[in-house]
Amino acid sequence: MAKGRFGSFYGTAAAGTDMIAEFKKKADLIHKPILATGFVVSKIAISGDPGVEFTLNGNTVVLPSTGIFETAIGMIDIESLIFKTSAKVNILYMY
């Protein structure tokens, strides 16, 4: 039995848009019966230009010099992801 599903986003994340809400809308269209118990992002990896600033669950994060940010699986429930300015990013997430 699968322990989760992956989703991805590549493109420009619009400033002020909650990307987790956007991911949920996409997942609802694809896996609605599976998501009857709720949508929780348990892992996320983001790559983009170094210095891109975003909030994750209300906490400010700045992409480091590598341009890569990643959480460990199941360490936190990711409820919101909002970029301060529009930024071209690649996001891989597990829910």
Model-derived regions: residue spans:
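Beta-sandwich interaction modules
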Residues: 28-37, 61-79, 92-95
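C-terminal interaction-tip segments
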Residues: 1-31, 84-95
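Short, surface-exposed beta-strand/strand-loop-strand elements in extracellular ectodomains
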Residues: 47-62, 90-94
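Beta-rich globular "head" domains
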Residues: 20-53
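Non-cytosolic beta-sheet module surface loops
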Residues: 45-48, 82-86
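Compositionally biased, low-complexity repeat tracts
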Residues: 3, 7, 12, 34, ...
